């Protein structure tokens, strides 16, 4: 079969990265091979994010650039590429995408992209403006192909999708649907596959991954803790992680597992969004700051070395200076290793967008600057505390310099070392940390590994 080129540009979360890999796997049997050169692509897929307005508008900006590429092809007498908008912008905006960008051929949601081969074949037969936004989570997981392209040393596996929490700022329940978990056998089989292909580390993915409740042997329902213990038995799998978690789903078994399972890394992303009880209630987060502090304390009791990460939103409607100070207070009390912070972005269709007490943009910007200064200071302090220590680093990619490779610590810090023959790629190695910056560490190979 003559190969055709497939170009995928991915926006947003790790789930989208995973979905893009699965799209490659879906289309490979039909003769489509991935390319990083958009100009040679027969099919162009934008796998999109709708979590913030800026992310959504990036899709339309990129589509404008693709339109110019299509026009150039036409002038040169070349065939046009098939253009697909996939992911959460597709789910949220649907037919509006065809109105704004009529040259798009296919709009497909995150729960129905397994139909891409059929949709693309219809476009080849000159059908236009095809759309599939069905919410059938069971069908998606049942239709996902087995891995064809190795993910490398670190692999993502989707185990849970959707969200039932309905935070008032968030589009996920509307774009990804209700919470649904893959069955244990599917997850275990995929984990065996990626490990046999060379993965040393697996990151389990879900919008609310710690709400996982998949069906296991004898129809037993497995919690996330059960699933992690099951996967930890796989030979040659050395590291396990999971993302993203909701505080209210951090149950006792999962917290205890952080203290008993050595393959479960001592790093947890646990978004809190705000430190103000008033704002947490307005966000419909279903917990208060005291509950969050209790979870953090219990995690640190179970595993004293655990390092935490979080998400924060500043400028949610009704946020006062006092509310913002509560957020700063929470940050200073918890002390994070790294964090992500954003200005509130009203999303159409969410309750937050209809609130009348929106915060002026300049105040959002001021608060974000103050918060990020605090978070960056904490991140730098944590990185600097690692200097002089020996850390186990999983090397997974080349650096920008010819003799450089990059790995990550158990705490998700990037570590740069000199390794001219690249002999340590794919290995976990003891590295002495010699230097720290805000975003990375520098290290040296211990004599025993030379």
UniProtKB/Swiss-Prot annotation:
Superkingdom classification of source: Bacteria
Q: Name one GO molecular function term.
A: N6-isopentenyladenosine methylthiotransferase activity
One Pfam annotation reads TRAM
The cellular location(s) given in this protein's UniProt record come to: Cytoplasm
UniProt-listed InterPro entries: Elp3/MiaA/NifB-like_rSAM, Methylthiotransferase, Methylthiotransferase_CS, Methylthiotransferase_N, Methylthiotransferase_N_sf, MiaB_methiolase, rSAM, rSAM_horseshoe
List the cofactors: [4Fe-4S] cluster
Query: For this protein, what reaction is catalysed?
Result: N(6)-dimethylallyladenosine(37) in tRNA + (sulfur carrier)-SH + AH2 + 2 S-adenosyl-L-methionine = 2-methylsulfanyl-N(6)-dimethylallyladenosine(37) in tRNA + (sulfur carrier)-H + 5'-deoxyadenosine + L-methionine + A + S-adenosyl-L-homocysteine + 2 H(+)
Residues in domain Radical SAM core? 149-381
Gene Ontology terms, cellular component aspect?
cytosol
TRAM domain: residues covered:
384-447
Q: How is the cofactor bound?
A: Binds 2 [4Fe-4S] clusters. One cluster is coordinated with 3 cysteines and an exchangeable S-adenosyl-L-methionine.
The positions annotated for binding [4Fe-4S] cluster 1 are: 13, 49, 88
Disulphide-bridged cysteine pairs: none
Which residues are [4Fe-4S] cluster 2-binding?
163, 167, 170
Record's signal peptide = none
Reported EC number(s) for this entry are 2.8.4.3
Start and end of every MTTase N-terminal domain?
A: 4-125
As for family, the record states: Belongs to the methylthiotransferase family. MiaB subfamily.
NCBIfam families per record: miaB-methiolase, MiaB/RimO family radical SAM methylthiotransferase
Q: What does this protein do?
A: Catalyzes the methylthiolation of N6-(dimethylallyl)adenosine (i(6)A), leading to the formation of 2-methylthio-N6-(dimethylallyl)adenosine (ms(2)i(6)A) at position 37 in tRNAs that read codons beginning with uridine.
SUBUNIT field: Monomer.
Q: What is this protein called?
A: tRNA-2-methylthio-N(6)-dimethylallyladenosine synthase
Instruction: Please name the taxonomic classification of the source.
Output: Bacteria, Pseudomonadati, Pseudomonadota, Alphaproteobacteria, Rickettsiales
Q: Name the gene.
A: miaB
